[in-house]
Amino acid sequence: DTFLADTRKDELPAGIFGFLEQFTGRLLALRQDFTPQIARLVASRLKFVQLPMRLLYLGPTFGQDGDGSRIEEHQGGAELIGEAGIKADAEVLGTVCLALKAMGFERFKVYIGDAVFVKSLLALPFQDNATRHAFCSAWRQRNLEALDVIVEKLPIDQQTKGTLVNLPFLVGSRDALKGRVSSSSWRPLQKSLQGVEGLFEALEDVLPEAEKCIELDLGAAPKHAYYTGLFFEVYAEGFPQLIALGGRYDQLFSVFETNVPAVGAGFKLSAIMKVRREPVNF
């Protein structure tokens, strides 16, 4: 199961380490992410197990870093499969925070985003795909000047244009963000904020100090395309590398001809060990 083959494509997405199999000529890829394999396992070998189920995993992942170097990392994680809704999201997110505290991390930040909100951005009436790609690039790079030029040409009202141009600033505590966007009537944004409110309410019993360590980043792009709702990234104070991430992926199981809601999280153990060795106060 370490090797994943995809005969439908002749190239691999960026960041994945792959090679041609010597005897068959098939394109093979080393595992970059555990979640698709967990979904395949549940849909095949565990399909008769009663839901919801909670699974843990531990093992190596393979990929490429920013300069193209091949890297091997160790990852551990947890998946809550078969349960939809905010309470399940809160259980996983709260578990991540409590686990980091148990590892000795006192100061870290969880940045949460919304994949539904992201899809609303991609569904805007762009002139063509090239413009959509340019918007995505400017949005991911938080390039205000480029965003302004692209958004100004969209056939939408001025208030929504103002909201879109300010995407890079949609970061902060829920109260700060609510104050910043209270004048916007754009429904995708307001709906996303309502979901955040529900998440914090669900976290009250799991993680009473959620306000101290969780911030919103509605201008963030998800690391994985299969996220369908909440997604999050975790960073230790004073350390630039990602130490944990996760999110909801309700549609991933459809690849295996089944329909199961799920949410999960993974810990970047190699990065966590590096933080523990660094002389920084985390």
What do the PLM-derived regions correspond to, one by one?
Residues 1, 110-113, 132, 213-217:
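Residue-level detector of family-conserved "landmark" positions at structurally sensitive sites
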Residues 12-23, 127-151, 156:
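Acidic, His- and aromatic-enriched active-site or binding-groove loops in soluble protein domains
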Residues 103-120, 131:
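Extended alpha-helical scaffolds
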Residues 1-36, 90, 111:
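TRNA-binding/sensing appendages of the translation machinery
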Residues 3, 25, 33-48, 54-105, ...:
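Positively charged, Gly/Ser-enriched RNA/tRNA-binding surfaces
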Residues 95-102, 116-126:
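Hydrophobic mid-domain F-helix/FG-region of cytochrome P450s
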Residues 1-13, 113-123, 220-229:
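Beta-rich nucleic-acid/ligand-interaction surfaces
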Residues 114, 142-143, 173:
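Short, solvent-exposed helix-helix connector turns and helix-capping sites enriched
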